[in-house]
């Protein structure tokens, strides 16, 4: 058998192997349920280092981006990008809210007082200070998850069908719409109703594009 014929015969096997080993394309964004009862104005959280509750009612009329954050994560580089996103879209009424969490890779290990110094001197470092509101560290999944995240997750299906490995899951109970990793994002409209949700794999740039498209549609209503 000639070399050319061998290649012809092997090609289908090589292609089959490629198809089987290629990772499935994950969705990055999912629209939220439109008939969900309640709004984020029913909830509140404790502001970081202030020991006072902030009612989300104060954001009535704003577009709010909820983000679960961590200081020692590979995605911590998104912090400056989130600063820039809020600054650029502030004229449109966008507000970013950050919620430190230690449930994913234990990448927010310190207490609340250590979060801002960690951001300033370690990651992203270089004197970085977040310009958006941060809240006290807490859970976003499991028995002790913050109630606002229970509402957000119930309102918005997760974009990905992949929950993760048992090794990576440290909370209980585990639910299908649980947050998978640091820096997932939820957009809430000016009426307090969740609009869309992004996987942690979505870049801030792609999130910005989606928000701008949403704002354009919003103006035409």
Swiss-Prot record:
Its main location: secreted. Keywords: Oxidoreductase, Peroxidase, Secreted, Signal. Residues 1-21 form the signal peptide. It catalyses: 2 glutathione + H2O2 = glutathione disulfide + 2 H2O. SUPFAM superfamilies: Thioredoxin-like. It is found in: Secreted. GO terms for molecular function: glutathione peroxidase activity. GO terms for biological process: cellular response to oxidative stress; lipid metabolic process. The active site is at 73. One of its GO terms (cellular component) is extracellular region. Its EC number is 1.11.1.9. The keyword Repeat does not apply. Epididymis. InterPro entries: Glutathione_peroxidase, GPX_AS, GPX_CS, Thioredoxin-like_sf. The keyword Ribonucleoprotein does not apply. Protects cells and enzymes from oxidative damage, by catalyzing the reduction of hydrogen peroxide, lipid peroxides and organic hydroperoxide, by glutathione. May constitute a glutathione peroxidase-like protective system against peroxide damage in sperm membrane lipids. Belongs to the glutathione peroxidase family. This is Epididymal secretory glutathione peroxidase. The gene is GPX5.
């Amino acid at each position: 058998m000639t070399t050319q014929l061998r290649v012809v015969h092997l090609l289908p096997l090589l292609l089959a192997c490629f198809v089987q080993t290629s990772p499935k394309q994950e969705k990055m964004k999912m629209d939220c349920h439109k008939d969900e009862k309640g709004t984020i104005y029913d909830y509140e959280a404790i502001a970081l280092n202030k020991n006072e509750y902030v009612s989300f009612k104060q954001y009535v009329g704003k577009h709010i981006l909820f983000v679960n954050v961590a200081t020692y994560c590979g995605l911590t580089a998104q912090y400056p990008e989130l600063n820039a996103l809020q600054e650029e879209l502030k004229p449109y009424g966008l507000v970013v809210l950050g919620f430190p969490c230690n449930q994913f890779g234990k990448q927010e290990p310190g207490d609340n007082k250590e979060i801002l110094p960690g951001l300033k001197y370690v990651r992203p470092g270089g004197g970085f200070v977040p310009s958006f509101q941060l809240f006290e560290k807490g859970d976003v999944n499991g028995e002790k998850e913050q109630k606002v995240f229970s509402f957000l997750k119930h309102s918005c299906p997760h974009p990905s069908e992949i929950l993760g490995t048992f090794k990576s899951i440290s909370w209980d109970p585990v639910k299908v719409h649980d947050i998978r990793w640091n820096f997932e994002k939820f957009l809430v409209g000016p009426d307090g109703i969740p609009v869309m949700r992004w996987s942690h794999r979505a870049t801030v740039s792609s999130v910005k594009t989606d928000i701008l498209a949403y704002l354009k549609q919003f103006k035409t209503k």
